[in-house]
Amino acid sequence: MRDILFAAADIWMIAVGLICGVKVIRGQHNYLIGLEWIIMGVSGSNFLVYGVTKAGPDSLTHHIAFFLDAFSRSIGFTLILVLGLLVVTHRYKPTLRVEVGAFSLAAVLGFVLSEFADEIGTPGKVFFLITALATSGFLSYFAWRLREIGERAHAVWLLGATALNVVVASIYDFWRIPGDDADHTRFYILALFTWGLAMLVIYRAYAAFAAHDKRVGAGPDPVTPAPGIEIA
């Protein structure tokens, strides 16, 4: 039963990541969120193969799984996500240089934090937790903004998904779920379901916010854009 639930949770995350990733690129032209969602979908696909084949720690799928996990936990589902949401919350559009730089930084940190995890030790785990909590803070702000524009249902769903994400991030490297097996199957069932839910909820909330901006004819704020950022 655990294996079935694990596969179902993973397939759920894969489907949400790939489908919503493509939709946010095609419909919203937001490559930051879209590509990160697709990367998480690919990560889930690789993790499914890794789990089904029972590949060992020396396998290619193992190294890819740890790299993509570190990629998203360090910069992808944190800084890149926040930059993508700023497009609707603050009407900014990151330049190509910012987009390429963000993904490049995520790739570098993903490699370092996955390949040298044992050498880095606890500081790396704390870094992942801090980035997750900081991102959750911004998502809470995003939920408040949604409430302010009348999208209360989206705000509630976002707060719920964010709360689950905080739980996952808090126990990821620091606490073992009672009764879990050596492969942490129960944890990954919870984590994969949570990440899929978070991506779906954020995608729908983003689309609702973008639609609101379009309805009210929101134009650029009369402020000076940050370095490397141009007004949409």
Regions found by a protein language model. Give the residues of each.
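Hydrophobic transmembrane alpha-helical segments in integral membrane proteins
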Residues: M1-V16, H184
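Internal transmembrane alpha-helix with an interfacial aromatic "cap," most often the third helix
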Residues: A15-I25, Y50-H63, F67-F103
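Membrane-interfacial loop-to-transmembrane alpha-helix junctions, especially the N-terminal start
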Residues: R26-V42, K93-A102, E151-A161, V216-G217
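Non-cytosolic membrane-interface motifs at loop->transmembrane helix junctions
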Residues: S59-F71, G121-I130, D181-A191
